[in-house]
Amino acid sequence: MEIKQAEFIISAVHPSQYPKDKRIEIAFVGRSNVGKSSLINALTNRKKLVKVSGTPGKTRLINFFLINNEFYFVDLPGYGYAKISKTEKKSWGKVVEDYLRGREELKRVILLLDCRHKPTNDDITMYKWLKYYNYNTIIVATKVDKVSKSQLFKNLKIIKDTLKPETGDEILTFSSLNKQGKEEFLKVLESVIDFYS
């Protein structure tokens, strides 16, 4: 699949603001600073489609991007940033849960993990949450250019052993810097789009 067109549509905090055109949605979620914005920019070949925030935990909105005039990438707010208040954490939880709960258009969730670190409790909770809502999930280990191949192999095993992915949930690797893993990722996304189209 080639992404030829990518357009920001809306930032939403409430379900009433979500697009109503019934197009397929693929959501991206992960810890603050896991490289979510950079990954979406790399997939779409657009350097500034998604603003890369210098302040972790700043994004509190759900951003919808129309891809190839056919489906949406949905950028969910990052989680796990220690310096936000309990009230902010609660509001983050509500925004994300409102979206995940019964969103028919959502056909796949991409859970991003920094390949250099063991999944955190927040990552484990998020994966369990996605399974609770019965979403098929693609786990993507980001920043793979920052580790050696042997270290990556070890770290992927740690990710598998920690999250214990359900059958059908794939683990992919990705580098926004050198685009490693991009073709494979796009192929997987294409199969999702084809399946539901």
Curated annotation (Swiss-Prot):
Pfam families in the cross-refs: MMR_HSR1
InterPro entries: G_ENGB_dom, GTP-bd, GTP-bd_ribosome_bio_YsxC, P-loop_NTPase, Small_GTP-bd
Sites where the protein binds GTP: 30-37, 57-61, 75-78, 142-145, 174-176
Gene3D superfamilies: P-loop containing nucleotide triphosphate hydrolases (3.40.50.300)
One CC-aspect GO term: cytosol
A GO molecular function held by the record: metal ion binding
GO biological process: division septum assembly
Binding-site residues for Mg(2+), renumbered to this chain: S37, T59
Keywords, comma-separated and alphabetical: Cell cycle, Cell division, GTP-binding, Magnesium, Metal-binding, Nucleotide-binding, Septation
Annotated EngB-type G domain residues: 22-195
Cofactor(s) the protein requires to work: Mg(2+)
Function: Necessary for normal cell division and for the maintenance of normal septation.
Family note: Belongs to the TRAFAC class TrmE-Era-EngA-EngB-Septin-like GTPase superfamily. EngB GTPase family.
Name this polypeptide is given: Probable GTP-binding protein EngB
Organism: Clostridium kluyveri (strain ATCC 8527 / DSM 555 / NBRC 12016 / NCIMB 10680 / K1)
